Every structure is written in C-alpha cells, then in structure tokens.
Amino acid sequence: MRTFIYLDESGDLGWNMDEPYQKGGSSRMLTLAAICMPEEKSKYIQRIVRALYAKRKRPLKNELKSVDLNLKDKELFLTLTTKLLSEHKDIQLRSITVHKEYVNARMKKDPNVLYNYMIKCLLLKTICNSQYVDFMPDRRS
C-alpha cells in the first residue's frame, strides 16, 4: 500500500525572541501539520482545495494561506474536512507544536535538528507501517 503524506508548517525556525514577532522577532511557536492517506484517497483532498480556490476565484498556482481566508471560507474548509474525516477513517490529520522558548540549546544551534525531530515524532509510526510512502513537504520559507 502506498501512503501519501503532505506536510506544512506554521511559524519559523528563527530564535530572535527579543523583538516582537514579525517586527524583527521570530515566532514563539513552531507547528508542523500533516495529512496522511492511502494514495487513492488523495482526490478527496484535492476536491476540498479546489472548492476553496473556486469560491475565492483564485488560480490553483497561487498558494492560499489560512490567514487570507475569511470566516465563511474557514467554516467551509472545516465543514468539508470534518465530513471527509468522518467518512474516511484511513485519512489522518496530525500536528505537533513546540513552544520554542523551551527548546534545548542543541536544537537551537541547528534548526534542522529540531525540524527533523518534530517530523520523527509526528510521522515515524505512519512511515514504518507503510510499504511505500510519497512524502510531500511544503517548501520551507
């Protein structure tokens, strides 16, 4: 069985906590979120994405950020996603969040160590239980 895993992040891997966030300072949290599903179920995720893009009259090539969604769009996304998850138990949403203030010094020295550790905690079991995995992380900014 082939498993598709899509990964995205919210926050950044910077460590400037002396300045306010987005005014020279880094995010205080880092979240990784993934959706894991059998290959044949990826079409259902694509339908949700297309529905949001169509509602906003936005081309698929332009990434849509949740911060750009209004309340009605967020409600539509949640409604469609909740319905999908209730009908397809083999589709999983997962997330992990770290409060960066409490990250140990070793992980602060090399941001990839923290990022990779979070991926391991989030996805290792799913990856090990799958014969084949297509791992599709979003490009990190």
Protein language model features and the residues they cover:
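Phosphate-ester processing/binding pockets and catalytic centers
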Residues: 1-141
